[in-house]
Amino acid sequence: MSEEQQVQPQLALERIYTKDISFEVPGAQVFTKQWQPELNINLSSAAEKIDPTHFEVSLKVVVQANNDNETAFIVDVTQSGIFLIDNIEEDRLPYILGAYCPNILFPFLREAVNDLVTKGSFPQLLLTPINFDAEFEANMQRAQAAAVEGQA
């Protein structure tokens, strides 16, 4: 066999961990009021190359719950994973880092947020599942449209 035939693509989750976590309840008066929260949820992802075959991919969510115009709680969680990515076509890397890996991390992030909120004595907060594949595709289309617009 030639060397080319022996080289197999590798994609594996080697480690998953909570990189950063915070839960704040600014004031106890929130527990004396009827619970009708307004939620502000911000989610972002990032990827960093650690070495030639490893990437750290992180999902970060910040949830602020306001009740009766007061901050009830703020949750800030960054869930990360170390992924082995080797012998993968370069043009597939953005999809893997921007959609495939976040799809793996999201259930862990969702569980961490819910655990913090319920341990903080609030009703459970289950983040709505996200289709990172669709988000990635939409971002690619926006980038292509912006590039075409910039050339016009």
From Swiss-Prot:
Pfam families cross-referenced by the UniProt entry: SecB
Keywords linked to the UniProt accession: Chaperone, Cytoplasm, Protein transport, Translocation, Transport
Keyword Hydrolase carried by entry: no
UniProt GO BP: protein folding; protein tetramerization; protein transport
Location within or outside the cell: Cytoplasm
Domain of life: Bacteria
Molecular function, one GO term: unfolded protein binding
Gene3D superfamilies cross-referenced by the UniProt entry: SecB-like (3.10.420.10)
GO cellular component terms, A-Z: cytoplasm
HAMAP family: SecB
Family label: Belongs to the SecB family.
Function: One of the proteins required for the normal export of preproteins out of the cell cytoplasm. It is a molecular chaperone that binds to a subset of precursor proteins, maintaining them in a translocation-competent state. It also specifically binds to its receptor SecA.
Subunit: Homotetramer, a dimer of dimers. One homotetramer interacts with 1 SecA dimer.
Protein name: Protein-export protein SecB
Organismal lineage: Bacteria, Pseudomonadati, Pseudomonadota, Gammaproteobacteria, Moraxellales
Gene expressing this chain: secB
